[in-house]
């Protein structure tokens, strides 16, 4: 009986669509059904390679369905408005859901309890102190050097609640749409293409998923990397220095991202002088922070890279050496 009902429904839909006979409607239904079926399949079986294959198929069908539609021209203001709406929706969706999880007491002490306590100490003393991180009063910077957190402090002064941190984190990620838009326009992409890139940005699972582990300094990385890339592309000294310093302030290992970006602009000869500046600043910052954390803090947690530290030295420079000398092993790991 179920099969008979299924066949009758298919026949009825086919007859209705035959009378409508709209070319775009066919493609809309094809794209929608493929996306729904593909998403349901990934939910049922979320193995990595199966998910990649399903995404490729859904992407190919989407390109086939909307390829001709991308030829229409959008003006600047509607494009900016659409991107702004995407950013607001991302902030509300991610910020509110993570806030609801916190308000339902689903937030763990590690790491959200640590950061909530740290911001309360920063509000009262301007020092990033915690007592629950290592069973005693100490500066969080002894564990991870992340002065970038002070950018959130003014908002925490006004609204002293952990919810402020979660909403602020979502807004920070959404702010990456601004440099993404500027980079796309610099490369003379169409407004329709810019919107698609922006849509990919907000729908990329890693953008929102990390927020559901609550607050973390790494959420600053993406927008700051994009801002630094844009500053280097524009060949501006002051913005390049400012965004380099902001990126370095995210964490003790953030110089790796800045150094790689600087190295890219050197090797590609797109901006050798400023790429060299970013690279040198990153190396100096990394050495300085690593030294002070080893001497006055709890070290740089290099044990996380033990699979790359082949000589047992515990040095992160060995990691860099291993990556250069054995790139195949790097890909394997």
Question: PLM ranges: what are they?
Answer:
Residues 96-97, 114-138, 147:
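Extracytosolic helix-loop segments that constitute the early lumenal/periplasmic catalytic or substrate-binding loops
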Residues 47-52, 168-174, 196-232, 246-258:
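Multi-pass, polyprenyl lipid-linked donor-dependent membrane glycosyltransferases
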Residues 11-20, 163-188, 227:
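Transmembrane-helix motifs of polytopic, lipid-linked glycan transferases
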Residues 146, 150-153, 158-178, 198:
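Loop-to-helix entry region of an early transmembrane alpha helix in multi-pass inner-membrane enzymes
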Residues 24-31, 174-203, 222-223, 239-242:
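Transmembrane-helix signature of polytopic, membrane-embedded enzymes
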Residues 257-284:
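Perimembrane helix-loop-helix junctions
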Residues 3-97, 271-278:
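Start-transfer (signal-anchor) and selected internal transmembrane alpha helices
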Residues 188, 217-220, 225-239, 266-270:
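Membrane-interface transmembrane helices that cradle and orient dolichyl/undecaprenyl
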């Amino acid at each position: 009986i179920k099969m008979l009902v299924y066949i009758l429904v298919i026949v009825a839909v086919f007859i209705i669509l035959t009378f409508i006979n709209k070319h775009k409607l066919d493609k809309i239904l094809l794209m929608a059904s493929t996306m729904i079926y593909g998403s349901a399949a990934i939910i049922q079986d979320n193995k990595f390679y199966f998910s990649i294959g399903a995404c490729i198929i859904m992407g190919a069908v989407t390109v086939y369905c909307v390829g001709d539609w991308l030829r229409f021209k959008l003006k600047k203001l509607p494009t900016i408005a659409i991107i702004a709406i995407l950013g607001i929706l991302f902030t509300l969706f991610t910020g509110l859901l993570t806030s609801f999880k916190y308000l339902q007491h689903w937030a763990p002490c590690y790491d959200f309890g640590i950061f909530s306590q740290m911001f309360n100490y920063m509000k009262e003393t301007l020092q990033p102190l915690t007592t629950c991180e290592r069973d005693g009063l100490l500066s969080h910077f002894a564990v991870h050097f992340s002065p970038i957190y002070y950018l959130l402090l003014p908002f925490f002064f006004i609204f002293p609640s952990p919810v402020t941190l979660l909403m602020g984190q979502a807004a920070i990620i959404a702010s990456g749409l601004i440099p993404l838009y500027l980079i796309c326009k610099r490369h003379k992409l169409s407004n329709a293409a810019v919107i698609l890139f922006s849509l990919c940005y907000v729908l990329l699972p890693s953008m929102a998923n990390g927020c559901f582990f609550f607050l973390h300094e790494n959420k600053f990385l993406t927008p700051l990397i994009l801002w630094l890339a844009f500053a280097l592309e524009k060949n501006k000294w002051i913005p390049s220095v400012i965004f380099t310093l902001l990126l370095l302030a995210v964490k003790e290992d953030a110089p790796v991202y800045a150094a790689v970006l600087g190295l890219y602009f050197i090797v590609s000869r797109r901006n050798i002088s400023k790429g060299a500046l970013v690279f040198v600043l990153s190396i100096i910052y990394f050495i300085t922070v690593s030294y002070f954390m080893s001497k006055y803090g709890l070290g740089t947690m290099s044990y996380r890279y033990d699979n790359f530290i082949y000589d047992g030295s515990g040095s992160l420079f060995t990691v860099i050496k291993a990556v250069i000398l054995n790139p195949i092993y790097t890909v394997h790991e």
